[in-house]
Amino acid sequence: MAPPSAPLLEQAPGEVGPTRRRGRRPRALKFADVAVYFSSEEWGRLRPAQRTLYRDVMRETYGLLGALGCAGPKPALITWLERNTDDWEPAALDPQEYRRWVTFQRKTRTRQKNEEKEVFPPKDVPRKGKRGRKPSKPRLIARQTSGGPICPDCGCTFPDLPALESHKCAQNLKKPYPCPDCGRRFSYPSLLVSHRRAHSGECPYVCDQCGKRFSQRKNLSQHQVIHTGEKPYHCPDCGRCFRRSRSLANHRTTHTGEKPHQCPSCGRRFAYPSLLAIHQRTHTGEKPYTCLECSRRFRQRTALVIHQRIHTGEKPYPCPDCERRFSSSSRLVSHRRVHSGERPYACEHCEARFSQRSTLLQHQLLHTGEKPYPCPDCGRAFRRSGSLAIHRSTHTEEKLHACDDCGRRFAYPSLLASHRRVHSGERPYACDLCSKRFAQWSHLAQHQLLHTGEKPFPCLECGRCFRQRWSLAVHKCCPNTHNGSPRPLIGGPNQRSSAL
């Protein structure tokens, strides 16, 4: 037996021998073989530093392949990375996924063109030039300016419902990430994650100055301007300054008066589509924001934030005059009128003025005689819901809050707090004119009528006005007051005869 012409090489199991590679040229290395791709969800989870590192590595890799002569045509991924944008684009997909996406977009555009031809037949539009040329653009301009259904997302107006549905399909392709709670759609998953915090109540961003928490970083940045006092946005018409650009934009509509977005249900007009969308919830009854503590639902996120402070006990707005704290800025503004004496709400019947609109509405019930709060137990009616709540405690006899000093019990903690000032001698409400102090705000309000001369309780029969409600009641019960029979006192005829 002849010896072999060449020595046999020992091979490890699974190793390809040199005879198998003979006659084959190695395949050239491509950028797609070494590149790393991200879906929109994966890209949204990357931190800014990770995205910067990814851009540098991919560019360096493509440059090395070019030095080896293996670069080929510039990939769509490199073109996207060279723009240094943080917004995800389909170019970041795997090449096979990217080709499928391009095919899907091409079919979608073809379907939309066919639908537009059905909605807007081009028979009345003149054609010029070559055969098969598309109709001219004035037809599409009329599509946006004519009246009809309104898109709740962008505020555009369409001639009919099919055109609106076609527009919504295009919007859904641009914003493929819907919110499972309210249906609002977003272009990127990071925006959806940030939006869902409005429903869950999650607030990961904390203010260093006051400890207030926010669901978005930009809201924290806007809030921190409150501590610095900076108002960088100036109105060019009146010079007024604002902390937010959105507040300036809303303010400028007071100068122009422009409100192009109309509610199809009631005809009310708004300056922005977002305000129109919030308003339409009053017609639909939609309340997309839910409190996780008590399951109460709200139409606006700001209302949910203010409500949640009831559970947390947070009161971030202190009064600089008496150090009392409030859960919302509107309640602080209303409270400060107690110290300033400002009363912007006037009664059109008796010229009495009030610091709060709710107090004016309650006062006007004296003129109308309306008592809209009836007791379901005895049928007695009251002008105020608070008076009804206090009255109902007489039926249930449930008084859970006891005074530590005298043992007297109360149905509500506010009544207990007011009563305890009798023992402590605390008088937190001071008159600005004579410095006299009172334990209850209602006593201060009655005292201030002596300085202003105001008499907010009118007699409906003779027109005479009184400073206090009980003075009006005594006036009505006096004999021959209105040239008629005297009205009985509250205690009945026996008490009245004994008093005489």
Swiss-Prot record:
Q: Where is this cross-link: Glycyl lysine isopeptide (Lys-Gly) (interchain with G-Cter in SUMO2)?
A: 455
Which stretches make up the KRAB domain?
A: 29-100
Q: Does the keyword Electron transport apply?
A: no
Span of zinc fingers (C2H2-type): 149-171, 177-199, 205-227, 233-255, 261-283, 289-311, 317-339, 345-367, 373-395, 401-423, 429-451, 457-482
Q: Does the keyword Ubl conjugation apply?
A: yes
Q: Which Pfam families match?
A: KRAB, zf-C2H2
Query: What is known about what this protein does?
Result: May be involved in transcriptional regulation.
Q: What processes in GO biological process is this protein linked to?
A: regulation of transcription by RNA polymerase II; skeletal muscle cell differentiation
Q: Which InterPro entries match?
A: KRAB, KRAB_dom_sf, Znf_C2H2_sf, Znf_C2H2_type
Species of origin reads Rattus norvegicus (Rat)
List compositional bias (Basic residues) regions by residue number: 128-137
Q: Where is the composition biased (Basic and acidic residues)?
A: 112-127
The similarity annotation says: Belongs to the krueppel C2H2-type zinc-finger protein family.
Protein name as annotated: Zinc finger protein 689
Cellular component, GO, one term: cytoplasm
Keywords in UniProt for this one? DNA-binding, Isopeptide bond, Metal-binding, Nucleus, Repeat, Transcription, Transcription regulation, Ubl conjugation, Zinc, Zinc-finger
Provide the residue span(s) of the region labelled Disordered. 1-24, 110-144
* Cellular localisation: Nucleus
Question: What Gene3D superfamilies does the annotation carry?
Answer: 6.10.140.140, Classic Zinc Finger
Q: Which GO molecular function annotation, any one, does this entry have?
A: zinc ion binding
Superkingdom is: Eukaryota
